[in-house]
Amino acid sequence: MRSIYVLIALLSCQVFSGCGQPNVAAPNNKTLNPATTESIAPDGNQFINPDGMTIKSRILLPEGFKRPTYRVEEFGNFLENLPLYPIDQEVHYYNGKIKPRNNIYNSVVKLDIGKRDLHQCADAVMRLRADYLYQQKRYKDIKFNFLSDSKPRTYTSYAKGNYSYPTYWKYLEYVFAYANTASLHDELPSVKTTQEVKIGDTFIQKGSPIGHAIIVVDLAKDSTGKTIVLLAQSYMPAQEIQILNNWNNSTLSPWYDIDQDIIKTPEWTFYPKNLKTWE
């Protein structure tokens, strides 16, 4: 009888995390709803500068493309200047174990993810947006809706005047535990067409029971207006943010042309209707 009570208690305490509902880590040997591909393209390294230590300095541009110029206070400037680990660094899970490259990613963003299994896919997207706002001291703008009631939990209410980084990180883990792909999907407005994509936009699928989210961390255009983007993700179990390779076009990888009917990434398949933006 005691074991039954314990089981009921455990089930009632499930928390919701970024990639799924509830927060159940995927086994290491299982990929959820993977993108399908007949063959894995070789690592595209023609656009990789191994000495670069930010997204902008490491990922080179294809001929004819230019990055937009962002003001220092813009989200785009924050994202393309995200710090990276050395080129040979592999992704670490929250527990210190390593996620093999398997041609999934080419670079790892140098940001701490904590010691709990919380920093998953939508969490990483929310975290980057929050980190940008925190850096700009726009504390009142840091807020995310919870899955339970679709109401925002604000950083200012949580911090109560204490805007130190430890308090900020506690707030983020609070959000990670009770917001996920479903809540973020419903919170953000849709983008009408992928041709209108902006840096910082995110592809989100709510999923049933598991969803996924990735974020546009860089963008470039050519003289005709054609747009290419870099995509980044975290995943399950909680792991460091990684810049994704493009299995569909090894001559363009890691850049993506998302003006397609289907956007296949190494671990998930998205569609134009999944593109969301920040208000």
Which sequence ranges carry the predicted segments?
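Positively charged n-region of N-terminal signal peptides that target proteins for export
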Residues: 1-4
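Sec-dependent N-terminal signal peptides
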Residues: 6-10
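C-terminal motif of bacterial Sec signal peptides marking the signal peptidase cleavage site
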Residues: 15-18
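Cationic-aromatic interfacial patches
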Residues: 22-110, 119
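Extracellular-facing segments of soluble proteins and assemblies that are Gly/Ser/Thr-biased and enriched
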Residues: 110-192
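Substrate-binding/catalytic groove segments of enzymes
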Residues: 134-138, 211-213, 222-227, 239-242
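...with weaker cross-activation on analogous glycine-rich loops/strands in unrelated enzymes
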Residues: 168-225
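Low-complexity, Gly/Ser/Thr/Pro-rich intrinsically disordered linker/tail segments
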Residues: 227-230, 234-279
